[in-house]
Amino acid sequence: MARQCEICGKKPMVGANVSHAHNVTKRRFNPNLQRVRAVRDGKPQTLYVCTNCIKSGFVVKAA
């Protein structure tokens, strides 16, 4: 499973951990993906969707 939203395509971003001593190490910010049973092309499917898409109503949940 790729860490990517199947609706909007949101992917991990690269950032930095910064300590109190200002030591910088790279880190990843992963999108908040949820497994949702949703209707796509008239059929129910299991999708990995970010919470922004769920809250915005881009996902129609299957019964």
Swiss-Prot record:
<dbReference type="InterPro" id="IPR026569">
    <property type="entry name" value="Ribosomal_bL28"/>
</dbReference>
<dbReference type="InterPro" id="IPR050096">
    <property type="entry name" value="Bacterial_rp_bL28"/>
</dbReference>
<dbReference type="GO" id="GO:0006412">
    <property type="term" value="P:translation"/>
</dbReference>
<keyword id="KW-0687">Ribonucleoprotein</keyword>
<dbReference type="Pfam" id="PF00830">
    <property type="entry name" value="Ribosomal_L28"/>
</dbReference>
<comment type="similarity">
    <text>Belongs to the bacterial ribosomal protein bL28 family.</text>
</comment>
<protein>
    <recommendedName>
        <fullName>Large ribosomal subunit protein bL28</fullName>
    </recommendedName>
</protein>
<dbReference type="GO" id="GO:0005840">
    <property type="term" value="C:ribosome"/>
</dbReference>
<keyword id="KW-0689">Ribosomal protein</keyword>
<dbReference type="InterPro" id="IPR034704">
    <property type="entry name" value="Ribosomal_bL28/bL31-like_sf"/>
</dbReference>
<dbReference type="InterPro" id="IPR037147">
    <property type="entry name" value="Ribosomal_bL28_sf"/>
</dbReference>
<dbReference type="InterPro" id="IPR001383">
    <property type="entry name" value="Ribosomal_bL28_bact-type"/>
</dbReference>
<dbReference type="GO" id="GO:1990904">
    <property type="term" value="C:ribonucleoprotein complex"/>
</dbReference>
<dbReference type="GO" id="GO:0003735">
    <property type="term" value="F:structural constituent of ribosome"/>
</dbReference>
